[in-house]
């Protein structure tokens, strides 16, 4: 490989990193209220055990109403700073690693066949998600703890954490470094499943479905991204629930003995339905995720003239 080709690849890697991160930061900030409601719904059983929630939420609308009443509108952005700090490098690394891995595989649909090309897209998406998680997991943990740190209806109700740094300080004091990485194994499995489907299906279906008049259409790209996001998030949601429930036990006396123990106890005590609590919010949350992947395409096209290949 020549020096010029190396410089070109490095330049494209930097473009992917920047565009992916900017797109994600904008979309996640706009979807922060939905993100928080989803996490509150998902973790409400652990919150009941810890005393930070008085009674179960009756649904998404009830969660919105009670949160606004007890904590104020601004509270819907609680944990958003950690989410942006986490999501910027996560999405940026996801997109950048994905394109880098795809270029290393160099699968061509015409030359290698659709099946091999499709498998390459799934692998590059999943591997990118797994690699990115290594760098940002503690921020995801902190975001989850802040978002699920609710203030109940009682006037004496107090929050457990006073901010991002306080989450790190208290967790390290009670659980050590391990506390920041509780739930890491199901997180890796979940992110590989989600990212593999998210990127793999999008990259595979986009050149097949978005042709002719639909090629370059932001609306068509957005709708395709939304449908794929819904499928990917639903498929990986039980793993997401397990990892977040494990996160919630850091600093607590009673903990789960691993991901399988957590999964077994949730199903036994609460029913399999509990693995999908908050999943309905993903219908709305998916709008933000779909916006990221379609906005990413548009930003590259507008700013750098880089078209999908």
Curated annotation (Swiss-Prot):
Membrane topology, as annotated, equals:
Multi-pass membrane protein
Q: Where is this region: Important for transport activity?
A: 243-248
Pfam families according to UniProt: Mito_carr
Q: What transmembrane ranges does the database entry give?
A: 13-40, 81-105, 114-134, 184-205, 219-239, 279-299
Which GO-annotated molecular functions does the record name? ATP:ADP antiporter activity
Chemical reaction(s) catalysed: ADP(in) + ATP(out) = ADP(out) + ATP(in)
**Motif Nucleotide carrier signature motif in this chain: where?**
243-248
* Keywords of the record: Antiport, Membrane, Mitochondrion, Mitochondrion inner membrane, Repeat, Transmembrane, Transmembrane helix, Transport
Q: Which GO terms describe its biological process?
A: aerobic respiration; heme biosynthetic process; heme transport; mitochondrial ADP transmembrane transport; mitochondrial ATP transmembrane transport; mitochondrial transport
Q: Where does ADP bind?
A: 86, 98, 243
Q: Where in the cell is it found?
A: Mitochondrion inner membrane
Q: Which InterPro entries match?
A: ADT_euk_type, Mit_carrier, Mitochondrial_sb/sol_carrier, Mt_carrier_dom_sf
Task: Write out the similarity annotation.
Answer: Belongs to the mitochondrial carrier (TC 2.A.29) family.
Full protein name = ADP,ATP carrier protein 1
